[in-house]
Amino acid sequence: MKRAVITGLGIVSSIGNNQQEVLASLREGRSGITFSQELKDSGMRSHVWGNVKLDTTGLIDRKVVRFMSDASIYAFLSMEQAIADAGLSPEAYQNNPRVGLIAGSGGGSPRFQVFGADAMRGPRGLKAVGPYVVTKAMASGVSACLATPFKIHGVNYSISSACATSAHCIGNAVEQIQLGKQDIVFAGGGEELCWEMACEFDAMGALSTKYNDTPEKASRTYDAHRDGFVIAGGGGMVVVEELEHALARGAHIYAEIVGYGATSDGADMVAPSGEGAVRCMKMAMHGVDTPIDYLNSHGTSTPVGDVKELAAIREVFGDKSPAISATKAMTGHSLGAAGVQEAIYSLLMLEHGFIAPSINIEELDEQAAGLNIVTETTDRELTTVMSNSFGFGGTNATLVMRKLKD
């Protein structure tokens, strides 16, 4: 099979709106979590979120942006960055059937779904809904709103698999490359951040509510006093490219994607089984002949999910566990965008030789004892890194990325 490498990165997140800002935040262990007046005013119990600190007004042509939700906007801006980072000219990717795009979101756009329904019930009816709500609200809005303005002629579709969405998009892109169907695939996703989305998670008791007065402390993966995840938004895109194609054009190669796992728990709609995660990591590691130096865990700061994943890691690695950190303690949980964002965080650590910390661990959960959980920024040369992304419905994705070797 052909080999797939990553040659470009683009990101808009709660800890930075480009690669340089994100890198600085990762090194400093800087939290992107803030107080949300919007969530408080909506009547929610959780008043904290990982918001994007960026005014996107005027950043995208109005004829393009009129079709977009925030999820699509974040993914579009990320794709612009990734293309520039990869050194791709328009001639290299536009109108080219060998260049495709796979990008999604976990929740579509609840904001525009609600807007459309509310407008329809109002006095103006359909006129108030307008012609652009469909592309903003539809589940495939992210891929549609990127493929059209970027003139993509290859594959073009969304994957939606809850919090594993954009990791699955990357994995599927790798498979397109391996099978020889595409030379380049832009892969990733975006997620909007709004009360209309957040309230659904608050209603099921999944969000943090104890730290509204200290937002930067609310996301605390592996801490004994964690009480739920902090919802976040943003986007990310990577350029997945066939190795020989990348070498031929002299591209900078961040890493080769040497492993991809995708499994289902088939056990519970919300609670992870752990067994599916074990199979997923083992699948991703199959044929990988170098040890995993660093694992970016799914680690969302939920009481059950965190320790289920750690138990799975123990089963997979035994007494040879890699260094582990959960970047969601800094960023919050961006749902469908989390997979690609955390792949990018892992790639930046691989590129720059360090491990970002799991912050806010004041009292380590006893079920995390004995594992190499990194709580301070650590300089270390890395060769092979793993990123886990798991979601409701028992969906699992694992990516293994390695510095290129012959």
UniProtKB/Swiss-Prot annotation:
Ketosynthase family 3 (KS3) domain segment(s): 1-403
Active site: 163 (for beta-ketoacyl synthase activity), 298 (for beta-ketoacyl synthase activity), 333 (for beta-ketoacyl synthase activity)
Cytoplasm among keywords: yes
E.C. number: 2.3.1.41
Regulation: induction: Mainly activated by FadR, but minor repression is also conferred by FabR.
SMART domains: PKS_KS
Keyword DNA damage listed: no
Major localization class: cytoplasm
Biological process annotations from GO: fatty acid biosynthetic process; monounsaturated fatty acid biosynthetic process
Domain of life: Bacteria
Example GO molecular function: 3-oxoacyl-[acyl-carrier-protein] synthase activity
Localization (cell): Cytoplasm
GO CC terms: cytosol
Mutagenesis / variant outcome for changing residue 140 to F: In strain: K1060 / fabB5
Pathway stated in the Swiss-Prot or TrEMBL entry: Lipid metabolism; fatty acid biosynthesis
Catalytic activity: a fatty acyl-[ACP] + malonyl-[ACP] + H(+) = a 3-oxoacyl-[ACP] + holo-[ACP] + CO2; (3Z)-decenoyl-[ACP] + malonyl-[ACP] + H(+) = 3-oxo-(5Z)-dodecenoyl-[ACP] + holo-[ACP] + CO2; hexanoyl-[ACP] + malonyl-[ACP] + H(+) = 3-oxooctanoyl-[ACP] + holo-[ACP] + CO2; octanoyl-[ACP] + malonyl-[ACP] + H(+) = 3-oxodecanoyl-[ACP] + holo-[ACP] + CO2
Keywords per UniProt: Acyltransferase, Cytoplasm, Fatty acid biosynthesis, Fatty acid metabolism, Lipid biosynthesis, Lipid metabolism, Transferase
Documented effect of changing residue 329 to V: In strain: M5 / fabB15
Known outcome of mutating residue 4 to T: In strain: MA-1 / fabB3
SUPFAM superfamilies, A to Z: Thiolase-like
Enzyme class: transferase
NCBIfam families, A to Z: PRK07967.1
Quaternary assembly: Homodimer.
Family: Belongs to the thiolase-like superfamily. Beta-ketoacyl-ACP synthases family.
This protein's name: 3-oxoacyl-[acyl-carrier-protein] synthase 1
Organism lineage: Bacteria, Pseudomonadati, Pseudomonadota, Gammaproteobacteria, Enterobacterales
Gene assigned in the entry: fabB
